[in-house]
Amino acid sequence: TPLYQLIHEILKNKEDKTKINLLFGNKTPSDILLKSEFDNLAKQHPDQFKVQYFVDKADKGFDGKVGYIDKDVLKSVLKGPSPTSHVFICGPPGVYKSVSGPKGPKGAQGDLSGILAELGYDKTQVFKF
């Protein structure tokens, strides 16, 4: 995930107090890339970094959630738009369509639509990887 590098850089800088909530969706628990790394970062920085895993199908013992990252999930995690809040999106086209609107051609960000637009975010607060 491209967000791993960003999260890692923020957390290793002791001066940076940015709070991060990672919502990580996958088909199954075995598809979760860098899970142990994210779990370790969450343990090392409990006041600054939180991670929640979402899967379509769970194995026994899975400690995350089964289902999609939908409007209710985003409303419960995001505190709403503010001048200092930013949302970073990475995923397949269906995720972009639902959450933020599709990316534009040749890597352009494209217009903001979907759940984040409904929640009041503007395109300066959302970055699509």
Model-derived segments and spans:
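Reductase modules of NAD(P)H-dependent flavoproteins
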Residues: 18-129
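Histidine-anchored nucleotide/phosphate-binding helix
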Residues: 2-14
